[in-house]
Amino acid sequence: MKNPTLLPKLTAPVERPAVTSSDLKQASSVDAAWLNGDNNWSTPFAGVNAAWLNGDNNWSTPFAGVNAAWLNGDNNWSTPFAADGAE
């Protein structure tokens, strides 16, 4: 018997509300990093630093201490490793 409270299929379209600079200014616990001048941003909610890049839902989170931000689809990235200066 199927559970009627199951989440919708993953293939359903996902809608994200638009985030404005005004929204971010009002959120005192949000540390926003604006990337590429096109409203890309990342915030540390509950230990998750999700970077939404280029409006195509690409994102990264600090699993096992890794915080990789992939920018512009050209493999530029940054990490919080003290000795790592990879670009």
Curated annotation (Swiss-Prot):
What are the record keywords, sorted?
Antibiotic, Antimicrobial, D-amino acid, Lipoprotein, Prenylation
The answer to whether keyword Ribonucleoprotein applies is no
GO BP terms: namely: defense response to bacterium
Report the residues modified as D-leucine: L35, L53, L71
Q: Post-translational modification, briefly? A: Kawaguchipeptin A contains a D-Leu and 2 prenylated Trp, whereas kawaguchipeptin B only contains unmodified amino acids. Kawaguchipeptin A is prenylated in vivo. Upon expression in E.coli of the whole operon, Trp residues are prenylated by C-prenyltransferase KgpF. Prenylation by KgpF is likely the last enzymatic step in the biosynthetic maturation of kawaguchipeptin A.
Q: Location of the Cyclopeptide (Trp-Pro) covalent cross-link? A: W34-P44, W52-P62, W70-P80
**What other comment is given for this protein?**
This peptide comes from bacteria isolated from a broom on Kawaguchi lake, hence its name.
User: How is this protein named in the record?
Assistant: Kawaguchipeptin peptide
Give the source species: Microcystis aeruginosa (strain NIES-88 / KW-MA1-3)
**What is the phylogenetic placement of the source species in the record?**
Bacteria, Bacillati, Cyanobacteriota, Cyanophyceae, Oscillatoriophycideae
